Amino acid sequence: MPKIKTVRGAAKRFKKTGKGGFKHKRANLRHILTKKATKRKRHLRPKAMVSKGDLGLVIACLPYA
């Protein structure tokens, strides 16, 4: 049986936490930032957790995480 390949794009975007969840960076903080409010940018700064509905997809992409 061959090894399962890790989806490299997912490996760069998600990190596993101690409890088994996955954290990721929020979107909308890369460019065109002048028109976005400081409060909005501040709230986008901390990492977010992958929702329960998407968790299975992330686990399938990262078999060895």
From Swiss-Prot:
Domain of life: Bacteria
GO biological process, alphabetically ordered: translation
Coiled-coil intervals, chain numbering: none
InterPro entries referenced in this protein's UniProt entry, alphabetically: Ribosomal_bL35 (IPR001706), Ribosomal_bL35-like (IPR021137), Ribosomal_bL35_CS (IPR018265), Ribosomal_bL35_sf (IPR037229)
UniProt keywords, alphabetically: Ribonucleoprotein, Ribosomal protein
Database matches in SUPFAM superfamilies: L35p-like
A Gene Ontology cellular-component term: cytosolic large ribosomal subunit
One of the record's GO molecular function terms: structural constituent of ribosome
PANTHER family reported for this sequence: 54S RIBOSOMAL PROTEIN BL35M, LARGE RIBOSOMAL SUBUNIT PROTEIN BL35M
Similarity comment: Belongs to the bacterial ribosomal protein bL35 family.
Protein name in UniProt: Large ribosomal subunit protein bL35
Organism whose genome encodes this protein: Enterobacter sp. (strain 638)
